[in-house]
Swiss-Prot record:
Keywords: Cytoplasm, Endonuclease, Hydrolase, Magnesium, Metal-binding, Nuclease. Belongs to the RNase HII family. RnhC subfamily. This is Ribonuclease HIII. GO terms for molecular function: magnesium ion binding; RNA binding; RNA-DNA hybrid ribonuclease activity. Manganese or magnesium. Binds 1 divalent metal ion per monomer in the absence of substrate. May bind a second metal ion after substrate binding. It comes from Streptococcus pneumoniae serotype 19F (strain G54).
Length: 293
């Protein structure tokens, strides 16, 4: 879902309201002055003067205020930082987040290497090209282990805010290395409104604007590079955790994870499970029920 934030003049806001007055709808949010339900989009006009447009038709209505969408190809031809995470949907293993800095002169090399969204590449291909990317591309990789994940979730963070913290920190540390991107793109995992809300909790900040875009790994090579390196980091962590416990840990959160989790629970108890899995997943309760049979 597209999400666009603007700060137009009060005159333009009133003109917009007059034009779309039949689409005005009630809102329980005390910070929203006006809320409009339009075909393929919603528009929230805040007391601060900001406007949030969301939905497939967001760009169409944003054009009323002079907004012009940047073509994907033009964004691709900029020095760019792209970020992505892997492990969020897997019960076992940590959460890997990577920020990568890619310049246009590296595009041919990356395409010849076969860089693409990690979801479209085999694990074998990822393990093959990731070491090359780590050597050739400036990046910052972060891995939150399952044990640390379990420690912070429910305390200071939730499943979304912890990703905001990791993406922000990866970008911050990469910028500290001296790279100068003209654009920063995050593969969207939440709304811009949510991202900004959780970002306010973080200490390390930077002034560069960011763009949250859905399916960004298919649009920007910098995000694709991050996707591949993050997947490699996640797979390596999954293997290492399994080796220490003596089990082959599956990726994902299906019945295979339930089965292995129950075996680990029986052998090592909750301490062993906390070492290798994200405990707030439903798989934990399913594993317990397996042992009760």
């Amino acid at each position: 879902m597209a999400s666009i934030t603007l700060t137009p003049s009060e005159k333009d806001i009133q003109a917009f309201l007059e034009h779309y007055q039949t689409s005005l709808a009630p809102s329980k949010n005390p910070y929203i002055r006006y809320f409009l339900k339009l075909p393929q989009a919603t528009v929230s006009i805040y007391t601060s003067g900001k406007i949030l447009l969301q939905g497939e038709g967001a760009e169409k209505y944003a054009s009323f205020f002079g907004y012009q969408a940047v073509e994907q190809t033009s964004g691709q031809n900029l020095p760019l930082i792209g970020t992505d995470e892997v492990g969020n949907g897997s019960y076992f293993g940590g959460l890997a987040v990577v920020a990568a800095f890619v310049t246009p002169d590296q595009h041919d090399f990356l395409r010849k290497l076969g860089v693409g969204d990690s979801k479209t590449l085999t694990d074998q291909k990822i393990r093959q090209i990731a070491p090359i990317l780590k050597e050739k591309i400036q990046h910052q990789a972060l891995l939150l282990s399952p044990s640390k994940y379990n420690e912070v979730i429910g305390d200071r963070y939730n499943a979304v805010s912890v990703k905001v913290a990791l993406h922000n920190q990866a970008i911050y540390l990469l910028l500290q290395k001296g790279v100068q991107p003209e654009k920063i793109v995050i593969d969207a995992f939440t709304s811009a409104k949510n991202y900004d809300k959780y970002l306010a909790q973080e200490t390390n900040r930077f002034s560069n604007p960011i763009s949250l875009e859905e399916k960004a790994e298919g649009k920007y090579l910098a995000v694709a590079v991050s996707s591949v390196i993050a997947r490699d980091l996640f797979l390596e962590n999954l293997e290492n955790l399994g080796r220490e416990l003596g089990y082959q840990l599956p990726s994902g959160a299906g019945t295979a994870s339930d089965k292995v989790a129950s075996q680990i629970l029986q052998a090592y108890g909750m301490q062993g499970l906390s070492f290798c899995a994200k405990l707030h997943f439903k798989n934990t309760e399913k594993a317990k029920k397996r042992l009760e049979r």
